[in-house]
Amino acid sequence: MKKILIVGAIILGSIGFSTSALAAISEQQAKDIALKEAQGGQITKFKLDKENGRMVYEVEVMDGNIEKDYEIDAETGAIVKFEQEQKGSGKAKSVNEPKISYDKAKEIALKNSKNGKFKEIELKHKNGVLVYDVEIAEGFADREFLIDANTGEILRE
């Protein structure tokens, strides 16, 4: 009976491990694929997520007032979904060029985290200030950082 339980535990453990295995393509490769396909613009949102049983990178690119959303298969690098939306010129603001990079904002958040793991980042306007909204997983809880996209200052944790 003990042998059956051990085998069952090994099987369940390996299934759990395979679903959380790292993506075959890197974050940078996914960003490069989206930017190449978009033919310009700036990444304003990025995250690795599970959709329909497979891992995908969700990438949002703003090009002027056009928002392009891509889902990129994390295993193959293929674009599995694409949506494009024209944002109105009313309240929607076009994204300005930030002075600090996406990678620098991610680094700042991770440095101020307690053994956290990167989950998601979004570049947006908040109260008239261009900020990176960075989400970090710390164990079973998520921690959110608002980082000024021009100074790198953490505005809110």
Q: What do these predicted regions represent?
A:
Residues 1-157:
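Long, terminal "pre-/pro-" and other extracytoplasmic accessory regions
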